[in-house]
Amino acid sequence: MAANLPNMRSIRRVMGVDPGLTRCGIGVVDGYPGLARLVGVDVLHTPADAELGDRLAALEDGLVQWLDRAAPDVVAVERVFSQHNVRTVMGTAQAGAVALLVAARRGVPVVWHTPSEVKAAVTGQGRAGKDQVAFMVRRLLRAPGLAAPADATDALALAICQLWRGAAMARLAAGGAR
Amino acid sequence: MAANLPNMRSIRRVMGVDPGLTRCGIGVVDGYPGLARLVGVDVLHTPADAELGDRLAALEDGLVQWLDRAAPDVVAVERVFSQHNVRTVMGTAQAGAVALLVAARRGVPVVWHTPSEVKAAVTGQGRAGKDQVAFMVRRLLRAPGLAAPADATDALALAICQLWRGAAMARLAAGGAR
């Protein structure tokens, strides 16, 4: 049925952000449910021995460059519900706040996905391991040789998750059949 | 002894920030150990039903206005070590990140104090209650009629704590007697 063919207008660009102070993963993909193309990938680093404010400012600079360069339709950020280490939660929250802030300043909508939503979207299993997520990201993007650390493949998985789920949620919101 | 007289050059202006998304307390004081003068106090509100990114952007606007207007020598922020509610920790961390970011962008140093350090500085007791902190803030600032909510008096207490402790830490760092 024609209604099931992907429409060119439905192609979206998503920038996934795996927030972190020491390593912040960035992954940009284009596509629609079932097809994702790699646009760009990066890991922003800030030195652990620098002042926290300077680290956040450096992170802001990097995120602004990526937002302006990639011009995504939407930014997808990992939603952290609970972690054992309060220090890690704080760093993740602080880095995530900067991503949110720069996206809001540019009028780019931000969506959130939990780690299990992301894992389920790319592997079919909400408790998949890091290696399996990285393997499936490379397969889905048809980039088997992609050299990228886990923070980067996690950000790409977030972006792919939004391509898949975002469209499904939009259909549900519009009252369409699934 | 002359060495114990406060030196005009030691007068510092501190802006205390009690970070929060729904209510962010701001308190600015001038002084030196033993004397604190109220400069300004405010609570920044952001609507709980707004997008998180827009809330952070509104908070940034308010903090920038206060930083530019008050021109503090240093910003003191509450250091959160642990809270039971992860959602509250995240909001505090996100709001604190914005305060850090805007201070770093303007080259204003940021210092951290734990709630118990703040309580001990203004009441002599690290486990003092909110009412006791608010009472002592009004007494120390000689502003018994100050109408300000707890978020604002907490921010003032943070600023006073930095006036007291900051000088002591600077003396210790310089190798002087306590």
UniProtKB/Swiss-Prot annotation, chains A, B:
The lineage of its organism: Bacteria, Bacillati, Actinomycetota, Actinomycetes, Acidothermales. Mg(2+) 2 binds at residue 78. The keyword Hydrolase applies. Its cofactor is Mg(2+). The RuvA-RuvB-RuvC complex processes Holliday junction (HJ) DNA during genetic recombination and DNA repair. Endonuclease that resolves HJ intermediates. Cleaves cruciform DNA by making single-stranded nicks across the HJ at symmetrical positions within the homologous arms, yielding a 5'-phosphate and a 3'-hydroxyl group; requires a central core of homology in the junction. The consensus cleavage sequence is 5'-(A/T)TT(C/G)-3'. Cleavage occurs on the 3'-side of the TT dinucleotide at the point of strand exchange. Its EC number is 3.1.21.10. It comes from the Bacteria. This is Crossover junction endodeoxyribonuclease RuvC. GO terms for cellular component: cytoplasm; Holliday junction resolvase complex. It holds the Pfam family RuvC. The active site is at 18, 78, 151. It is found in: Cytoplasm. Mg(2+) 1 binds at residues 18, 151. Its main location: cytoplasm. Keywords: Cytoplasm, DNA damage, DNA recombination, DNA repair, DNA-binding, Endonuclease, Hydrolase, Magnesium, Metal-binding, Nuclease. One of its GO terms (molecular function) is magnesium ion binding. The keyword Hydrolase applies. GO terms for biological process: DNA recombination; DNA repair. It comes from Acidothermus cellulolyticus (strain ATCC 43068 / DSM 8971 / 11B). Belongs to the RuvC family. The gene is ruvC. Homodimer which binds Holliday junction (HJ) DNA. The HJ becomes 2-fold symmetrical on binding to RuvC with unstacked arms; it has a different conformation from HJ DNA in complex with RuvA. In the full resolvosome a probable DNA-RuvA(4)-RuvB(12)-RuvC(2) complex forms which resolves the HJ. Binds 2 Mg(2+) ion per subunit. It catalyses: Endonucleolytic cleavage at a junction such as a reciprocal single-stranded crossover between two homologous DNA duplexes (Holliday junction).
